[in-house]
Amino acid sequence: MYPLARRILFALDAEKAHHFTLDALNMVYKLGLIPVTGNRTKPVKLMGLDLPNPVGLAAGLDKNGEYIDALGALGFGFIEIGTVTPNPQPGNPQPRLFRVPEYQGIINRMGFNNHGIDAMIQNIEKSKFSGVLGINIGKNAVTPIENAADDYLICLEKAYAHASYITVNISSPNTKNLRALQGGDELSALLEALKNKQAQLASVHGKYVPLAVKIAPDLDEAQIEDIAHVVKSVEMDGIIATNTTIDKSSLGSHPLAGEQGGLSGLPVHEKSNRVLKLLADHIDGKLPIIGVGGIMEGRDAAEKIRLGATAVQVYSGLIYKGPALVKECLKALAQ
């Protein structure tokens, strides 16, 4: 069924197909045609949260929390929405999303296009979803990098009451200078500020919402070691490895190899796994890792768990394989 749908969708502009697919999924869900499945096939504890299974949806598919209920019916163990910023922003000019089917890859330079944190919260409040919901937060493009912490703090405060966990996205390649926040001193200052705010909010709301940070695949071992040291010292609750890569050498002479943006899907598989393995070695079990990047079939999810991840997330694989990928991953993890 999905291979036929994919042929039709891949004939459309990538971004238009993205919105069409989500709208269609939402309509089918509202008509009651998606059998809601809990998929408690492999329960796992992540950052103190009880997941029915370890296969989650990565941020980026539902940027504004408009499709939470429909996505929640597909059997994910957890869902992450965003990236969201304090204020609405249009993102980068179109075209900004490209498929590379020969390599099962996707290039995006979306640029955190979203309706803002207030609109997202309204969508969450309308949702009936009762599962584990992560909110991925970022900074507005117009905010100077030296003031980035202000944007993250605004989003953290507003999202706190509505999230099961919150992810600090400092690794998108499509917001100018954002990845500089992965540097030791910059990272330490940002995460310390967020952890202090987290403690205040936990007291106010009477609940503890875990904080994770999402890192890039384009890091050398020294940088990974520095990040591991910082996240352990500030006592982050989790880390997500990885975001998209800016390295498109795997595409060879493909016409899209020169496009700006982050590359995801199969081409990021090895780079993401390398970071995951090194990170797991340096973290030494002090906090859980969510593995994401290049999961195109069930054995890819199982490989990330073997390399040290507690849970995994998928996105690009869904575009190429459809919702059946979730069950395929769960089957592989159950073996």
UniProtKB/Swiss-Prot annotation:
<keyword id="KW-0560">Oxidoreductase</keyword>
<keyword id="KW-0472">Membrane</keyword>
<comment type="similarity">
    <text>Belongs to the dihydroorotate dehydrogenase family. Type 2 subfamily.</text>
</comment>
<dbReference type="InterPro" id="IPR012135">
    <property type="entry name" value="Dihydroorotate_DH_1_2"/>
</dbReference>
<dbReference type="GO" id="GO:0044205">
    <property type="term" value="P:'de novo' UMP biosynthetic process"/>
</dbReference>
<dbReference type="Pfam" id="PF01180">
    <property type="entry name" value="DHO_dh"/>
</dbReference>
<dbReference type="GO" id="GO:0005737">
    <property type="term" value="C:cytoplasm"/>
</dbReference>
<dbReference type="InterPro" id="IPR050074">
    <property type="entry name" value="DHO_dehydrogenase"/>
</dbReference>
<comment type="pathway">
    <text>Pyrimidine metabolism; UMP biosynthesis via de novo pathway; orotate from (S)-dihydroorotate (quinone route): step 1/1.</text>
</comment>
<feature type="binding site">
    <location>
        <position position="63"/>
    </location>
    <ligand>
        <name>substrate</name>
    </ligand>
</feature>
<feature type="binding site">
    <location>
        <begin position="315"/>
        <end position="316"/>
    </location>
    <ligand>
        <name>FMN</name>
    </ligand>
</feature>
<keyword id="KW-1003">Cell membrane</keyword>
<feature type="binding site">
    <location>
        <position position="169"/>
    </location>
    <ligand>
        <name>substrate</name>
    </ligand>
</feature>
<feature type="active site" description="Nucleophile">
    <location>
        <position position="172"/>
    </location>
</feature>
<dbReference type="InterPro" id="IPR005720">
    <property type="entry name" value="Dihydroorotate_DH_cat"/>
</dbReference>
<feature type="binding site">
    <location>
        <position position="294"/>
    </location>
    <ligand>
        <name>FMN</name>
    </ligand>
</feature>
<feature type="binding site">
    <location>
        <position position="265"/>
    </location>
    <ligand>
        <name>FMN</name>
    </ligand>
</feature>
<feature type="binding site">
    <location>
        <position position="83"/>
    </location>
    <ligand>
        <name>FMN</name>
    </ligand>
</feature>
<dbReference type="GO" id="GO:0006207">
    <property type="term" value="P:'de novo' pyrimidine nucleobase biosynthetic process"/>
</dbReference>
<dbReference type="GO" id="GO:0106430">
    <property type="term" value="F:dihydroorotate dehydrogenase (quinone) activity"/>
</dbReference>
<keyword id="KW-0285">Flavoprotein</keyword>
<comment type="function">
    <text>Catalyzes the conversion of dihydroorotate to orotate with quinone as electron acceptor.</text>
</comment>
<feature type="binding site">
    <location>
        <position position="242"/>
    </location>
    <ligand>
        <name>FMN</name>
    </ligand>
</feature>
<protein>
    <recommendedName>
        <fullName>Dihydroorotate dehydrogenase (quinone)</fullName>
        <ecNumber>1.3.5.2</ecNumber>
    </recommendedName>
</protein>
<dbReference type="InterPro" id="IPR001295">
    <property type="entry name" value="Dihydroorotate_DH_CS"/>
</dbReference>
<dbReference type="GO" id="GO:0005886">
    <property type="term" value="C:plasma membrane"/>
</dbReference>
<feature type="binding site">
    <location>
        <position position="169"/>
    </location>
    <ligand>
        <name>FMN</name>
    </ligand>
</feature>
<dbReference type="InterPro" id="IPR005719">
    <property type="entry name" value="Dihydroorotate_DH_2"/>
</dbReference>
<feature type="binding site">
    <location>
        <begin position="243"/>
        <end position="244"/>
    </location>
    <ligand>
        <name>substrate</name>
    </ligand>
</feature>
<feature type="binding site">
    <location>
        <position position="174"/>
    </location>
    <ligand>
        <name>substrate</name>
    </ligand>
</feature>
<comment type="subunit">
    <text>Monomer.</text>
</comment>
<dbReference type="InterPro" id="IPR013785">
    <property type="entry name" value="Aldolase_TIM"/>
</dbReference>
<feature type="binding site">
    <location>
        <position position="136"/>
    </location>
    <ligand>
        <name>FMN</name>
    </ligand>
</feature>
<keyword id="KW-0665">Pyrimidine biosynthesis</keyword>
<feature type="binding site">
    <location>
        <begin position="59"/>
        <end position="63"/>
    </location>
    <ligand>
        <name>FMN</name>
    </ligand>
</feature>
<keyword id="KW-0288">FMN</keyword>
<feature type="binding site">
    <location>
        <position position="214"/>
    </location>
    <ligand>
        <name>FMN</name>
    </ligand>
</feature>
<feature type="binding site">
    <location>
        <begin position="108"/>
        <end position="112"/>
    </location>
    <ligand>
        <name>substrate</name>
    </ligand>
</feature>
